[in-house]
Amino acid sequence: MSVIQLLHGTDHIIEVPDIHIGNPHNDYGMGFYCTRVDEMAREWACKKNTDGFVNSYDFDTEGLKVLNLLDGTHTVLNWMALLLQFRTFKLDSEVAVDARDYLIGHYSIDLTGFDVVIGYRADDSYFQYAESFVSNTLPLRSLNKALKLGKLGEQTVVISQKGFDHLHFINAYPVSRSVYYPKFLDRDTKARDTYRKEIKKSKSYRDDIFVLDILREEMSNDDPRIQRILFE
């Protein structure tokens, strides 16, 4: 048996999570979005500038099928493809539209049969990176670097009824907006500052890869040019 603790920060207590309550346009579609990092859960609880709660659960992963996008066998492009599949992007050019279709067609992963997804969390600041990559203004190296800023950007999402049945509520504790809303804003601001720096630096990356290069060269996940940048 492998039991881990999952935390869900929100504005109310959730003793029994419901698979039917959620947003189908979240990062990985409908599901229960959690973190294993207490500070992250506290920030989520107060992200609307209200007091909130961190709900704590024991989660038994025994017998569950887990897709771990961070285990080294997948790349940031797999994450991008799933994001493009579920989230609503601003596609204001033909390149962006073609990039969406190509990445979904060649890099997406069928979530059917999976109970849990572990991957990056595309909050507003991270989502800005993703949109810029699809629009061909941010290179792959900068996108990959941005998503490795720290574990606070990682999440565990329960996406099947079988997975929900493995969640066991422990307790919930209150979180003050006066403490954690400023922290939420500060982290977002730092991520945006890093984004601007990466955009500026990307102009000098002569050997980098932009999404248009991936389209023109029809690059796959195991292309040595992509591997060189992602694992340098």
Segments predicted by a language model, with ranges:
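Extended catalytic/binding region for NAD+/ADP-ribose chemistry, centered on the ART fold
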Residues: N23-K48
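Extracellular structured ligand-interaction cores
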Residues: I4, G31, V54
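Short, charged/polar surface micro-motifs in flexible loops or helix N-caps
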Residues: I13, D38-M40, E62-K65
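Short His-Asn-centered micro-motif
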Residues: H8-T10, C34-R36, Y57
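ADP-ribose/NAD+-binding catalytic cleft of ART/PARP-like enzymes
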Residues: M1-D27, F231-E232
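Extended interaction regions within the primary functional domain
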Residues: H12, H20-G22, Y57, L67-D71
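Conserved NAD+-utilizing ADP-ribose enzyme module
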Residues: S2, K48-G52, T61-E232
